[in-house]
Amino acid sequence: NLVGGLVALFAFMNSSLSGAASRFIAYSIGENRGESKNVFSSLLTIHCIVAFVLVLVCETIGIIFFDRLVIPETRLYAAKIAFHISVAATAISVLRIPYNASIIAHEDMKVFAYVSVAEVLMKLVIVFLLNIIVLDKLIIYSWLYLAVVVIVTLIYSIYCIRSYSDAFALLGFV
């Protein structure tokens, strides 16, 4: 229940942040006053702060929760590793939001669809690999999921930087 609730919370948060970010970018593109680079830079800075606060809160509260959860002693190490990797994957997903929003605002849905299909296929490969691998499946799944999140984030960010002039902004510096 705890994991399911957290997943639902983060899915809602990502969806809300992405919708708001794409509105800001689309509005700045529509205004055509050359402010879209500033808007994207501001969004990237805000999402970096949100990701940092998210990691800080999750890691702090996570320590408290691990003392209260009933986890078999033999699985405690794997559960802690999976938790830390999941926090990192969530933070990277938050950092991806401005790039997703930029693609949506530029109405480049073909790229969004191709990358989404590739992401689902990579996750399917993970499921097949888990049947083959003899190591701790929870730890391996966590690392492979983090790899998928990093790969997809890199694809989105590289595509946006190459395709849109407003996406080449680094944390408040235009």
Map each language-model feature to its residues.
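Small-residue-rich midsections of specific transmembrane alpha-helices
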Residues: 1-29, 47-48, 54, 88-96, ...
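Interfacial/gating helices of multi-pass transporter permease domains
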Residues: 1-9, 37-39, 80, 138-143
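Alpha-helical transmembrane segments of multi-pass membrane transport and lipid-handling proteins
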Residues: 41-70, 129, 154-155
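Alpha-helical transmembrane segments of multi-pass membrane proteins
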Residues: 60, 64, 73-96, 113, ...
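Helix-loop interface residues and adjacent transmembrane-helix termini in multi-pass membrane transporters
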Residues: 76, 105-106, 135-136
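Membrane-interface junctions at transmembrane-helix termini in multi-pass inner-membrane proteins
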Residues: 91-115, 128-129, 139, 160-164
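Alpha-helical transmembrane segments of multi-pass membrane transporters
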Residues: 114-137, 151-157
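Interhelical loop/hinge segments that connect adjacent transmembrane helices in multipass membrane
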Residues: 138-144, 156-174
